[in-house]
């Protein structure tokens, strides 16, 4: 029997507000353990939560970006459970009335077709702290993350393959990143994914029993975990067994999913309205004000890059993968940069440098201005493409003016025949054996002089001019 795969994803996104959702503590990542805490985070008796308006702004922005309806009379609920990193023994979340509902985004599949994926809901909540287990036999609780604002985005079960899930996550990450409400860095925990997967016989409308996958710390691991779980469930069903509703974790080493626990239902959390927070009236004016802050989104930019700048769909997709790179490209073109040349540099040397240094484009010295300046120096023959790579590395590490560095470092390309011809004659004098080979008609003997000339000029000879002059002087040499 053949089965259809059914996948839904729950994505937790940390919002990049300065302070936490219900306390004034810093929400920034990477501080010393328990440095970003106060009495609210520790749940001291008598303390009350105070709503951070910026979190609601971010929630509205996310809902609009994901084509969602907005609950304009919004409230919070208590989700009750006990765990050491949750000192209140409940989490403030949203249950029956999330800030956003009935949304959708489009994904692009490998064959170029597009598919709409519905989004059931997006709700605001506080993050939990973090448990660490020491080698000394003790467990430690770090509450820096406790109360950091989250938005959980829950898709409908519209995906039919691990590849579609990967495409959905890619599109969702781009959209959230463009809104500016989160940096969506999985390596720092600001984007976390849980995947729900079930199988059903083709033609059956009713969903099968699902398993939830956790410990998915990259999009590739989401795909790998789903592929393994797809195979595991199919094997169980074909052997006459039944799938249990359970939570499983993905083991990156073995590539397998491993049982963690039997999955709880929402009734296990005993949700009820949060009594210490009021209802929040989200007015039409409030929504309209946030709507004005929405950016141009990746799909819109991709269409513009193809139609207005003549780039390929592939180039447009690469440039818009991160907002920082796309913004850099747009500014470079706006100040006169050739779109194709800027695109080539961003996808080539710049991307390689960023990967090798593990940095983003905002963290290096390269700017739209000095990149366009450098491309202009190539175009007017001041430097060669080879020399430009050296110039780029300097700009990336140190910033500054491309032209000033080229002059200071003596990298200006030699194009003057009155300078090049004496150098060519000196090359002949320094390589008598090669001259004899050339005069005797030895095959490819002339090509050796190209390397000698470039070496003599330290790579600064203008290749087109130098090759033309070299051919001219070799012809004279042959006649002697």
Curated annotation (Swiss-Prot):
Show the catalytic activity: L-glutamyl-tRNA(Gln) + L-glutamine + ATP + H2O = L-glutaminyl-tRNA(Gln) + L-glutamate + ADP + phosphate + H(+); L-aspartyl-tRNA(Asn) + L-glutamine + ATP + H2O = L-asparaginyl-tRNA(Asn) + L-glutamate + ADP + phosphate + 2 H(+)
**SMART domains hit by this protein:** GatB_Yqey
Q: Which Gene3D superfamilies match?
A: 1.10.10.410, GatB domain, N-terminal subdomain
**From the UniProt record, which GO molecular function terms apply?**
asparaginyl-tRNA synthase (glutamine-hydrolyzing) activity; ATP binding; glutaminyl-tRNA synthase (glutamine-hydrolyzing) activity
Record-stated family: Belongs to the GatB/GatE family. GatB subfamily.
Show the SUPFAM superfamilies listed in the entry: GatB/YqeY motif, Glutamine synthetase/guanido kinase
Q: Could you tell me what this protein does? A: Allows the formation of correctly charged Asn-tRNA(Asn) or Gln-tRNA(Gln) through the transamidation of misacylated Asp-tRNA(Asn) or Glu-tRNA(Gln) in organisms which lack either or both of asparaginyl-tRNA or glutaminyl-tRNA synthetases. The reaction takes place in the presence of glutamine and ATP through an activated phospho-Asp-tRNA(Asn) or phospho-Glu-tRNA(Gln).
Key word Nucleotide-binding present: yes
Which top-level group of life is the source organism from? Answer: Bacteria
What is the name of the protein in this document?
Aspartyl/glutamyl-tRNA(Asn/Gln) amidotransferase subunit B
Classification via PANTHER family: GLUTAMYL-TRNA GLN AMIDOTRANSFERASE SUBUNIT B MITOCHONDRIAL AND PROKARYOTIC PET112-RELATED, GLUTAMYL-TRNA(GLN) AMIDOTRANSFERASE SUBUNIT B, MITOCHONDRIAL
This protein's assembly is summarised as: Heterotrimer of A, B and C subunits.
- Name the UniProt key words of this record, in alphabetical order: ATP-binding, Ligase, Nucleotide-binding, Protein biosynthesis
């Amino acid at each position: 029997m053949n089965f259809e795969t059914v996948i839904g994803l729950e994505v937790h996104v940390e919002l990049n507000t300065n302070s936490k959702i219900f306390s004034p503590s810093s929400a920034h990542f990477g501080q010393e353990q328990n440095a970003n805490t106060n009495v609210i985070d520790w749940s001291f008796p008598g303390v009350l939560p105070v709503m951070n308006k910026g979190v609601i702004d971010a929630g509205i922005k996310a809902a609009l970006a994901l084509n969602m309806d907005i609950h304009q009379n919004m409230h919070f609920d208590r989700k009750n459970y006990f765990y050491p990193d949750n000192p209140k023994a409940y989490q403030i979340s949203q249950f029956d009335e999330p800030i956003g509902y009935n949304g959708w985004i489009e994904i692009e599949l490998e064959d170029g077709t597009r598919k709409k994926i519905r989004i059931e809901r997006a709700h605001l909540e506080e993050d939990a702290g973090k448990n660490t287990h020491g080698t000394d036999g003790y467990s430690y609780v770090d509450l820096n993350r406790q109360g950091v604002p989250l938005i959980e985005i829950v898709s409908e079960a519209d995906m039919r393959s691990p590849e579609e899930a990967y495409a959905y996550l890619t599109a969702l990450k781009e959209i959230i990143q463009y809104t500016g409400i989160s940096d969506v860095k999985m390596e720092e925990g600001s984007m976390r994914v849980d995947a729900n997967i079930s199988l059903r016989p083709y033609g059956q409308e009713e969903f099968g029993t699902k398993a939830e996958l956790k410990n998915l710390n990259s999009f590739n691991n989401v795909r790998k975990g789903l592929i393994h779980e797809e195979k595991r469930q199919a094997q169980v069903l074909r052997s006459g067994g039944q799938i249990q509703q359970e939570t499983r974790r993905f083991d990156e080493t073995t590539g397998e999913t491993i049982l963690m626990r039997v999955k709880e239902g929402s009734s296990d959390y005993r949700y009820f309205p949060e009594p210490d927070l009021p209802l929040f009236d989200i007015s039409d004016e409030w929504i309209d004000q946030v709507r004005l802050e929405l950016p141009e989104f990746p799909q819109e930019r991709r269409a513009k890059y193809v139609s207005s700048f003549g780039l390929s769909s592939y180039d447009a997709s690469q440039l818009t993968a991160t907002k920082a790179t796309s913004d850099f490209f747009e500014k470079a073109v706006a100040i006169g940069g050739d779109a194709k040349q800027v695109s080539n540099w961003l996808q080539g040397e710049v991307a390689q440098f960023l990967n090798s240094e593990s940095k983003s484009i905002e963290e290096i010295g390269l700017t739209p201005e000095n990149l366009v300046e450098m491309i202009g120096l190539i175009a007017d023959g001041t430097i060669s493409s080879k020399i430009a790579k050296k110039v780029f590395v300097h700009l990336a590490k140190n910033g500054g003016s491309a032209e000033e560095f080229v002059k200071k470092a003596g990298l200006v390309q030699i194009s003057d025949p009155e300078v090049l011809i004496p150098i060519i004659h000196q090359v002949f004098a320094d390589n008598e054996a090669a001259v004899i080979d050339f005069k005797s008609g030895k095959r490819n003997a002339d090509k050796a002089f190209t390397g000698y000339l470039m070496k003599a000029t330290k790579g600064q000879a203008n290749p087109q001019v130098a090759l033309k002059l070299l051919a001219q002087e070799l012809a004279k040499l042959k006649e002697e």
